[in-house]
């Protein structure tokens, strides 16, 4: 298991994509906690996983201030197919987040 902060909707997601490609056993990502005002990095990650990017590297559907990635489509597409993302952004309840983690460990 890896736990970390996604600090931005661009560089942070680029780093996460490269990490996931390097470690193909990474299958599940839980997006939780508060969004950073302006960046909306959690929402951007969910949009990337759902919609991908346009030809300019802009995350389709992202509503943050700078949702542009430098990763190539060759990296983005395997990331999108390799991982499942669970949206718990609105959940402030640690019991719900812990329950979701237990589901992953029992699989």
Model-based region annotation:
Residues 1-55:
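Conserved mixed alpha/beta catalytic, RNA-binding, or beta-rich assembly cores of soluble enzyme
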Residues 19, 68, 79, 104-105:
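Phenylalanine-focused residue identity feature
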Residues 33-90:
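Long, charge-dense
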Residues 95-107:
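Charge-patterned, long linear interaction tracts outside catalytic cores
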């Amino acid at each position: 298991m890896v736990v970390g902060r996604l600090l931005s909707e661009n560089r942070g997601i680029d780093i996460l994509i490269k990490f996931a490609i390097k470690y193909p056993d990474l299958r599940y990502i839980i997006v939780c906690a508060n969004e950073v005002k302006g960046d909306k990095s959690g929402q951007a990650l969910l949009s990337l996983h759902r919609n991908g990017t346009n030809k300019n590297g802009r995350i389709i559907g992202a509503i943050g201030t700078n949702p542009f990635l430098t990763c190539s489509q060759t990296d983005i597409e395997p990331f999108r197919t390799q991982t499942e993302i669970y949206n718990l952004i609105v959940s402030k309840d640690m019991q719900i987040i812990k329950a979701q983690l237990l589901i992953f460990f029992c699989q």
